[in-house]
Amino acid sequence: MEKILNKLKKSKFRSSFHLNKKMRDYVTDKGIDVIKTHAYDFVNKRLKIYDTNKDGKQTPMRQVHPVFIAEHATATCCRGCIEKWHHISKTKILNDNEIDYIVNVIMKWIESEMDS
């Protein structure tokens, strides 16, 4: 996982995402375990099954939830980005191991943001 996170840090676009104060406060207030639950919920509802009509549009880019910002920063925001960066086919239904991997990447990034 460190290898992909380091690669993402070198991307001008991916490295431009950061949690603002409001998002950091939200993580602190809710707690990391609740944020992880949200991440699982978003990934299962928005990314598990590939939808050609929604892919690339399902994750807001505004600072509305820390998981959304993390998804853009970690290229887990849509199935096209997941395929390009994480080499998981965009047309297959994500299995539990793939969902765990995606959520762990998201959470590692959020934890890193909270520590910086």
Language-model regions, residue ranges each:
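Short Fe-S-cluster ligation motifs
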Residues: Y101-S116
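Iron-sulfur (Fe-S) cluster-binding segments and ferredoxin-like electron-carrier domains
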Residues: G80-D100
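Immediate flanking context of iron-sulfur cluster ligation sites
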Residues: K54-T74
